[in-house]
């Protein structure tokens, strides 16, 4: 959250140059405060586990967040009871008339399937298109990040020969972005995917900005220049055991998976896993929710044209 300071205080310029969020008394006096309304499109097989992971991160912010859970209405969930889905999830027809401050679209176990061949691809496209007019900011995770870059910006992904699984070191490629406030120069994040985006295509796209990358895992954080879409190529929401669970699941299915890199102590799958990314995941979601949702969204959600442009802040 910002530090409120007197108008024209000399320290303001110094703090802003250090990427510290300060707010003048004049602007603070004109701020309206209400709960943030966030919609989560949960495409992961284990709905309850993913709900818990995302709500854990949203609940670690200073803001009050009201959450709605969204499903693809004609897609049966094989790993979550129909009672749970009917009780807690909404269909798109229930929300298409609404506006939201934020939308999170999760990953999905569809890494080797062409987007156009995904059975519910038309529904995904419809929701993404809807979000550009009805949501202040959209957070795309892993598979959804690739899908969003493909649908909105025409970028194609490359299928990897083997699944990329592990915890990798990343670095910021920019310094003075609100999303990166408080980030270390290098930080860890987990990945679990069968595809990657071309870093140079992202760099050269006029509507996109590459904010963080990894020598081993490639592009990680990509932000649209209108600040509306944030693409996260990894899984900062994962809990400590998730990569281990996926590894043993794939072993049980005789898929001959590689051991997740930099995850187990001494890279020994019989040893304990080491969670190195939780503080990063918490900071990433907190910064997104604060700087790209709360600071930009209109008080009256019925008027999405009243969004505050970044340039005026």
UniProtKB/Swiss-Prot annotation:
Superkingdom, natural source? Bacteria
Q: Which reaction does it catalyse?
A: L-homoserine + succinyl-CoA = O-succinyl-L-homoserine + CoA
One Gene Ontology cellular component: cytoplasm
Q: What class of enzyme is it?
A: transferase
- Which cellular compartments is it found in? Cytoplasm
SUPFAM superfamilies per record: Class I glutamine amidotransferase-like
Q: Does the keyword Acetylation apply?
A: no
Principal cellular location given in the protein's record: cytoplasm
Q: Sorted alphabetically, which Pfam families does this protein's record hold?
A: HTS (PF04204)
- Any one of the GO BP annotations: L-methionine biosynthetic process from homoserine via O-succinyl-L-homoserine and cystathionine
Entry binding sites for substrate: 163, 192, 249
Which residue positions hold the site described Important for substrate specificity? Answer: 192
| GO MF annotations, alphabetized | homoserine O-acetyltransferase activity; homoserine O-succinyltransferase activity
To which pathway does this protein belong? Answer: Amino-acid biosynthesis; L-methionine biosynthesis via de novo pathway; O-succinyl-L-homoserine from L-homoserine: step 1/1
Keywords (alphabetical) are: Acyltransferase, Amino-acid biosynthesis, Cytoplasm, Methionine biosynthesis, Transferase
- Residues annotated as catalytic: 142 (acyl-thioester intermediate), 235 (proton acceptor), 237
User: In chain numbering, where does the site feature Important for acyl-CoA specificity fall?
Assistant: 111
EC no. given is 2.3.1.46
Enumerate the NCBIfam families for this protein.
Answer: metA
The text of the family note is: Belongs to the MetA family.
Per its database record, what is this protein's job?
A: Transfers a succinyl group from succinyl-CoA to L-homoserine, forming succinyl-L-homoserine.
Q: What is this protein called?
A: Homoserine O-succinyltransferase
Organism per entry: Shewanella oneidensis (strain ATCC 700550 / JCM 31522 / CIP 106686 / LMG 19005 / NCIMB 14063 / MR-1)
């Amino acid at each position: 959250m910002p530090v409120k300071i007197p108008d024209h205080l000399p320290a303001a310029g110094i703090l802003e140059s250090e990427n510290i969020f300060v707010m003048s008394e004049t602007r603070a006096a004109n701020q309206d405060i209400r709960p943030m309304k966030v919609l989560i499109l949960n495409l992961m097989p284990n709905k309850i586990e993913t709900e818990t992971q995302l709500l854990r991160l949203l609940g670690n912010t200073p803001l009050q967040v009201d959450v709605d859970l969204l499903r693809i209405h004609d897609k049966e969930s094989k790993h979550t009871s129909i009672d749970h889905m009917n009780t807690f999830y909404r269909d798109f027809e229930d929300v298409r008339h609404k506006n939201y401050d934020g939308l999170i679209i999760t990953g999905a176990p569809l890494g080797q399937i062409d987007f156009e061949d995904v059975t519910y691809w038309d529904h995904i496209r419809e929701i993404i298109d809807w979000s550009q007019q009805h949501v202040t900011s959209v957070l795309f995770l892993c598979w959804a990040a690739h899908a969003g870059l493909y649908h909105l910006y025409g970028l194609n992904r490359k299928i990897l020969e083997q699944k990329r699984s592990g915890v990798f070191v990343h670095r910021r490629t920019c310094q003075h972005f609100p999303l990166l406030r408080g980030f270390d120069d290098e930080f860890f994040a987990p990945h679990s995917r069968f595809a990657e985006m071309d870093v140079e295509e992202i760099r050269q796209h006029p509507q996109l900005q590459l904010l963080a990358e990894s020598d081993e895992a490639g592009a990680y954080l990509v932000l649209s220049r209108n600040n509306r879409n944030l693409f996260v190529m990894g899984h900062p929401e994962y809990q400590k055991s998730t990569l281990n669970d996926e590894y043993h699941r794939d072993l049980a299915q005789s898929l001959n998976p590689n051991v997740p890199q930099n995850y187990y102590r001494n890279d020994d799958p019989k040893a304990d896993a080491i969670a190195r990314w939780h503080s990063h995941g918490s900071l990433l979601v907190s910064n997104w929710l604060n700087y790209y949702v709360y600071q930009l969204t209109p008080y009256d959600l019925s008027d999405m044209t009243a969004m505050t442009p970044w340039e005026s802040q």
